[in-house]
Amino acid sequence: MTSAEAPDTPFEPKKILAQLPHMPGVYRYYDAAGAVLYVGKARDLKKRVSSYFTKTQLSPRIAMMVTRIARIETTVTRSEAEALLLENNLIKALAPRYNILFRDDKSYPYLKLTSHRFPRMAYYRGAVDKQNQYFGPFPSAWAVRESIQILQRVFQLRTCEDSVFNNRTRPCLLHQIGRCTAPCVGAISAEDYAVDVSNAARFLLGRQSEVMKELEQKMHAFAAELKFEQAAAVRNQMSSLATVLHQQAIEVGSDSDVDILAVVAQGGRVCVNLAMVRGGRHLGDKAYFPTHVESALTLAEGGLGDDTDADAVEAPDVPAEAPVGEPGSARDTTASIEAEVLDAFIAQHYLGNRVPPVLVVSHAPASRDLLELLSEQAGHKVSLVRQPQGQRRAWLSMAEQNAQIALARLLSEQGSQQARTRALAETLGLECDDLATLRIECFDISHTMGEATQASCVVYHHHKMQSGEYRRYNITGITPGDDYAAMRQVLTRRYEKMVEQAAQAAAADDAAGIDGESTRQAEASSLLPNIVLIDGGKGQVEIARQVFTELGLDTSMLVGVAKGEGRKVGLETLVFADGRAPLELGKESAALMLVAQIRDEAHRFAITGMRAKRAKARQTSRLEELEGVGAKRRQRLLARFGGLRGVVAASVEELASVDGISHALAEQIYKQLH
């Protein structure tokens, strides 16, 4: 059930507060523009929402937020647990300004064992299914690949694609170096391979002692039967496993699956360090930095009612510094902040995802309902350990240290980036009241001998690269290798729409009797960057100047980055389109460091896109030209033979064995490819 204050009537809190029930649910605050300010949950909606409007000693910041509330929506739920789940979903979907937000990282890597007769071991990201076996999640791709290398060395499981496996005629190099038992050519039976797969799975689950004991029994059995070669092979396998266990003795504990969560607040930012233990092995950690922290943490500044502890993401402001003090001091405030951030992380990270049976945490969670909901969702009891002992205590201490290191690194990088942004603005003579609003776009053209030409546009805003705003442009209709034409095309496509939108807004304002010129300027400034970097010299900048002149844009924002002698970093020259003399900044210039950083990112983004486009064209172009072969048949051919090279090497009989391809069509395909 949802209730809301009508947006077209003056906001009267008393009216809607009187209608709120004494029931659990979720509430949402909106401003006059319809933007969501905050999403919260409550065990008693009437009591919780009323506290924002009935308390008289609110802090100035909370009072300011309350004055911005133009509409309230509430949703009644059947239980507090249901309210918590709905709150978490709404926070992820709406990203309110005053809620703590963590990046929604759904694609944690897993180690996958496929359901093939000879299962393949593979690195995997994405949704899990019941058909295959999945181990993880792992904190990083490196942790997965390290585990794969260990399993290759000890159990020699295959890692090749099924299409390659089905077409092998002799063992690959991995078999020759003792990293695969070559099931592709029948060098091992399905039964023996299944034993290796089972041992590998138990190893990943932390049951290494069972595996070692069974291998020892197997070795003695072979020796008793005078099968000394087989006994020696098992002995070597035991030796490899013992070596791995010895190398990882420091990180192996009695726990099977545990997550360690440490939170540190400092310098106005918060870091959550998540360390993962799977199968008793410490797999590494990952640092998370929530956004909207300062805004979100203002909401509990004034102690909003007796129901405050029911809301999982409310806490006081993050202070710039947190010195040691008496109870109620900045140190206590920081501890409260860290606990609330931990609640937000647990809710956003684990609800809807796999949860290990044990969470070792640096702070006691504020929400009492969260643990019950996690246990219900996981299908097993989830325990939170606040004061661990032994190995768990060492893991938590290490996680806290890593959180402090990651946070210090972030703050240092932020300070460095802000200094670079300021230096560039001063160098170019830009007047910018808030450097965080300075927007820089950079363009680069990439191709190989005129093939697969692509242009890239990267964006620098709020003192960092904004990868979500990057764009690639496929360049068509030009002479291959003509970088000038490519630059003209991408700049026209990029900014022509922005100019049209500004003109439409100005026309609408004129029709409404508003000063069209001032509105148009405001519209253009919100759409266009402050600086446009062009990876190139005078020729590229001249093309950019022509495009901007045709579009009626200010050419003073155009800056070319010409490479220096020998293309050495630090010798670049800035070239301007408005007649200013070229500028050489020197290797130690903070402004040049920022320009080079943005330029290099544009080049990287263009190169990766160009390579992918070129590889796709080379792999599929000949198959797409085959008569009688559509998309489905082409996919079957690629799946059967592993790629274009395999299709070309196939005989007529092999082609005809593919589902949907007759013998006559196979002959036709063979003739077209040879």
From Swiss-Prot:
The keyword DNA repair applies. Signal peptide: none annotated. SUPFAM superfamilies: C-terminal UvrC-binding domain of UvrB, GIY-YIG endonuclease, RuvA domain 2-like. GO terms for biological process: nucleotide-excision repair; SOS response. It is found in: Cytoplasm. Residues 209-244 form the UVR domain. GO terms for cellular component: cytoplasm; excinuclease repair complex. InterPro entries: GIY-YIG_endonuc (IPR000305), GIY-YIG_endonuc_sf (IPR035901), GIY-YIG_UvrC_Cho (IPR047296), Hlx-hairpin-Hlx_DNA-bd_motif (IPR003583), RuvA_2-like (IPR010994), UVR_dom (IPR001943), UVR_dom_sf (IPR036876), UvrABC_protein_C (IPR050066). Keywords: Cytoplasm, DNA damage, DNA excision, DNA repair, Excision nuclease, SOS response. Residues 22-100 form the GIY-YIG domain. It holds the Pfam family HHH_5. Belongs to the UvrC family. The UvrABC repair system catalyzes the recognition and processing of DNA lesions. UvrC both incises the 5' and 3' sides of the lesion. The N-terminal half is responsible for the 3' incision and the C-terminal half is responsible for the 5' incision. PANTHER family: UVRABC SYSTEM PROTEIN C, UVRC/OXIDOREDUCTASE. NCBIfam families: PRK00558.1-5, uvrC. This is UvrABC system protein C. It comes from Burkholderia multivorans (strain ATCC 17616 / 249).
